[in-house]
Amino acid sequence: SLDDVLGGVLVEPVRGTGLSWFLQERGELRHLRAYAVQRSLYHLKEADPHTWVLPRLSGRAKAGMAAVQYDEYGAGRAERLHARLFADLMADLGLDATYGRYLDEGCAPMLVLVNLMSVFGL
């Protein structure tokens, strides 16, 4: 069944093995800062490419996507924009939150992700 196939993917293990677990359990400030630098390439613009899909959707799909985007854009409150929240995190870590500031430090997988999201949005 579909539940059996997806069951293992949808349940987080008690002891994680991913990056978030590493940062929580063993990570140092330098690790968090390096992670934020990489993620800044995506998170400082995160909702914009997704919004480009709205004109291509209709009905329930469009309404659902618009609801997600409403949250991404802070539910109408500028201080709650997800990109703003990430910029605040970067500032708290002593990092420059200017979009694209760390482009030259971006690793290949992150650059692929950012470019792919923009291409799919177009």
Regions found by a protein language model. Name each.
Residues 1-122:
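Non-heme di-metal
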